[in-house]
């Protein structure tokens, strides 16, 4: 039986049915998933009860996997495989993280609008998130369509941002919430990297904004002007008409295209309810500036 596809929104989010991702995927089903992903950018696969190993195997169909940033900390006991980002609120013993736990405070940055791994010179192509335990109230994820947001920009704004390069750092987004607890290894790993503000997607040919709370400066622009422009673009891109809220069900698997979306996790009572979320992240094929044919020196 071929997979089924149900559009949740006309051109942004779709639900994929009649497939068990814990089993080998046929070439025709994989091709259909990839075609749907190019069109929609966010795909929802309900009722996926597979193992972490099957999760990672599915993700590898889309490219090489990233390693969790928590691997940088020798004092951090990882709960999951190093290729799996642990973005819930549980410690290594599956207990709820204390309110003052470093990992919890770090994870609060995920409630800002962001794009996964835009703080890496080679950023993410896509993220594939599995919901193992879901709070009964809150904790949904909002997604913003940066392709549609780009299309809706005034033409003079499109011309204004063409060729502009922002500097992204994980420390920038965390500092917005007052989190600065990084060791020297992390500070070196999270030095700012250049990313274009607008990019063309090679598979569809569409233009998209490329934004995240990790971005704090724009090359060749005063800090205040850069922050104002980044806020203006983010406010534009997160208007209701560009945003879809996914309300999680246990064992939902959601994958999204990090090249042309932003997302944020919404509040929930993280001292009362467990939220076990496991993400595989696939690397992009090249740095964004390189993909846009721009030679950008390190600063």
Predicted regions and their residues:
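Fe(II)/2-oxoglutarate oxygenase catalytic core
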Residues: 3-255, 259-299
């Amino acid at each position: 039986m071929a997979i089924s596809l149900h559009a949740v929104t006309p051109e942004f989010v779709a639900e994929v049915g009649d497939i068990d991702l814990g089993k080998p995927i046929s070439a025709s089903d994989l091709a259909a998933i990839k075609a749907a992903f190019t069109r929609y950018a966010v795909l929802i696969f309900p009722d996926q009860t597979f193992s972490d190993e099957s999760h990672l195997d599915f993700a590898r169909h889309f490219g090489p996997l990233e390693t969790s940033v928590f691997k940088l900390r020798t004092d951090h006991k990882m709960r999951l495989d190093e290729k799996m980002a642990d973005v819930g609120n549980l410690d290594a013993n599956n207990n709820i993280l204390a309110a003052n736990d470093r990992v919890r405070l770090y994870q609060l940055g995920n409630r800002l609008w962001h794009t996964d791994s835009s703080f890496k010179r080679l950023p993410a192509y896509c993220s594939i998130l599995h919901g193992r335990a879901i709070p009964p109230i809150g904790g949904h994820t909002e997604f913003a369509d940066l392709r549609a947001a780009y299309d809706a920009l005034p033409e003079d704004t499109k011309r204004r941002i063409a060729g502009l390069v922002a500097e992204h750092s994980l420390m920038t987004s965390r500092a917005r919430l007052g989190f600065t607890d990084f060791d020297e290894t992390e500070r070196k790993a999270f030095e700012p990297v250049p990313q274009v503000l607008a990019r063309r997607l090679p598979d569809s040919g569409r233009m998209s904004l490329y934004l995240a709370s990790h971005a704090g400066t724009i090359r060749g622009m005063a800090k205040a002007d850069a922050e104002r422009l980044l806020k203006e673009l983010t406010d534009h891109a997160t208007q209701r008409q560009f945003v879809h809220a996914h309300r999680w069900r246990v064992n939902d698997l959601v994958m999204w295209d990090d090249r042309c979306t932003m997302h944020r996790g919404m509040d929930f009572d993280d001292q009362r309810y467990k939220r076990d979320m496991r993400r595989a992240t696939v690397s992009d094929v090249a740095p964004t500036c390189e993909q846009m044919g721009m030679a950008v020196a390190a600063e």
